[in-house]
């Protein structure tokens, strides 16, 4: 079966934004104009096509990013048919993991901002994630019909708060209830979408007289931005004072793909104005899979290899999302980087080092699907029938094994205990939690050794609320939920060398394990590193993994207060063994004892998670808000002016002090202040607090 759409006509894009910028409505309009959905689903009615989990329809927020394939030929049918794969991503801060995961497999993104609230804290997070993965992007300033909408202000915020070179390619005609349409600053024409057919048709008109001067000035800025793409264009522009439409578009495309500029459009998805032009901009300015650098990976001999977007290259794909579907079981969403995968074919999971077989391949339209015979380089689809695949695993050709870079996922910061309500719920709960953890790497499940309680940990209270909710709905598990607990951690601050010795020799077969360990702190976020420095076989090779295992078990159980130890390097540099009495168990215990003893000598400290908190409050309550944050051991990092006399307070506050903050803030401000928080970093807990926690845990 040959390729139906040439790869240069593919666009793999994400629609990203913070909560309530109108991203899902925008995606809905995209599906409508591309002819895939015949009746527009409204988020207000709980009927949007991409929000297909019941909780999303109730809460009006998007939780799982559904991948949707659509086709577009342009507003004036000016293009050959392009295939646009859209990944709708959640904007709530507890789901940043989903956003991170989507950006990893996209070639470009459309970032949606609200015309009245502009750049919000969550927008900054998303923007930083897109920077990290070098994702070229376009901006769509939505909700231009809302009270307080101001295109220029949002553009300035993007320039100042996000540090981006933002080049508008449109200008709004009117705003708030007078929002009429947009001016195309490349063609220098006004676009007027029809109100009678939901914006399916439009007319070009002359630019309104009152906007002519401003449009001319913005057109000039845009052409200058295009001219900077090359010396030849700049010379032509300086000589002739103008560039052709094709030259402008080609140059802006090149600079967008190089992440030098960000083009901005505006409109109102809800009022059916502007989304069609965003689709044209996606085709005109965002990259096809062949326009971005080939993905690099590591082969079996640890050499770096590239996988070009080519059907003839060996097959390589990344699993970026696992979803459980009540009808077909597990769906593994994959982005194919190179080669071809046929349904029914075998693949190799290079991270788990296992061979698997793909049963069927389906292409998802928000909530229905078409079966495919095969997928090729550049495709995004879902595979059915894979047994043991986790988010971030690489699937590849068994004869050309490669590991594409893994995604790094943040440590969870909040833990709650869950108990099944009845014996029948007990078994179901285990299965449900296992499935949910496979879907979401930022969610962890463990059993507390002492209390035998099941503990679930995640990125915030909303994250865990939704997990508990999904257990009830999708798996029919009723459970009681405990009070949230802070996920403290431990680490060390100095370097030590320490002996770990486990000897039991009293007649018959004994136990003998003896190691010398060097334990030292690593920088924050580095994780655990084990170094084998044994020379001359003083500890036999077959016992070394056991030492590593013993150390890791002790790290998991902590040394101060039973919390996991982070960011240490342990080097095994000496030891001894007994011909008869040494075995794996003895060396495992020796490693564990050595680590515990050493960590207690290496200035151990208790770490607490600190959150980046941003409070939006009317000026009258500013004093109370700041005073309250100080009382919660918060460090105020700065204050900004928002719109209409509203102040923004930026602070860093320990998570343990933030429980119940929503209620306190509401009552302190009569419900007029709001806040958002996200995990920032682990820091040393103050001595008095650490002491109290350690005492209560021991």
UniProtKB/Swiss-Prot annotation:
GTP binds at residues 17-24, 88-92, 142-145. Keywords: Cytoplasm, Elongation factor, GTP-binding, Nucleotide-binding, Protein biosynthesis. SMART domains: EFG_C (SM00838), EFG_IV (SM00889). It holds the Pfam family GTP_EFTU_D2. Transmembrane segments: none annotated. One of its GO terms (cellular component) is cytoplasm. One of its GO terms (molecular function) is GTPase activity. Residues 8-290 form the tr-type G domain. It is found in: Cytoplasm. The keyword Protein biosynthesis applies. Gene3D superfamilies: 3.30.230.10, 3.30.70.240, Elongation Factor G (Translational Gtpase), domain 3, P-loop containing nucleotide triphosphate hydrolases, Translation factors. GO terms for biological process: ribosome disassembly. Belongs to the TRAFAC class translation factor GTPase superfamily. Classic translation factor GTPase family. EF-G/EF-2 subfamily. PANTHER family: RIBOSOME-RELEASING FACTOR 2, MITOCHONDRIAL (PTHR43261:SF1), TRANSLATION ELONGATION FACTOR G-RELATED (PTHR43261). Catalyzes the GTP-dependent ribosomal translocation step during translation elongation. During this step, the ribosome changes from the pre-translocational (PRE) to the post-translocational (POST) state as the newly formed A-site-bound peptidyl-tRNA and P-site-bound deacylated tRNA move to the P and E sites, respectively. Catalyzes the coordinated movement of the two tRNA molecules, the mRNA and conformational changes in the ribosome. HAMAP family: EF_G_EF_2_B. This is Elongation factor G 1. The lineage of its organism: Bacteria, Pseudomonadati, Pseudomonadota, Gammaproteobacteria, Alteromonadales.
